[in-house]
Amino acid sequence: MIQPQSYLNVADNSGARRLMCIRVLGSSNRKYANIGDMIIAVVKEAVPNMPLKKSEVVRAVIVRTCKGIKRNNGMILRFDDNAAVVVNQEGNPRGTRVFGPVARELRDFNFTKIVSLAPEVL
């Protein structure tokens, strides 16, 4: 579960290294975000000489959470870190590569481009 003030790793090569969630998109009083949800975040740590700079406000899709998600077959999928992929207004990733595994549920939320770039889909 990701809430405002939560820090996330960035799972792509957009230039950001760490993000801090400042808003969970959805209904007006939504408190938590999970895998496949869109958030508004601020770049807290960035790679030098890349398009994204520190203190830039971006949109991101959550691809991994420590809390995990429960599937219909009873399996619970948990990851080692909280991670997100920086996206543009249309939901397409800003980077050209995605690092680490992502959940299969992203395909259900129409983030097929992120799923196709990922090296491993669990």
Curated annotation (Swiss-Prot):
Pfam families: Ribosomal_L14. GO terms for cellular component: chloroplast; cytosolic large ribosomal subunit. Keywords: Chloroplast, Plastid, Ribonucleoprotein, Ribosomal protein, RNA-binding, rRNA-binding. One of its GO terms (molecular function) is large ribosomal subunit rRNA binding. Part of the 50S ribosomal subunit. Binds to 23S rRNA. This is Large ribosomal subunit protein uL14c. The lineage of its organism: Eukaryota, Viridiplantae, Streptophyta, Zygnematophyceae, Zygnematophycidae. The gene is rpl14.
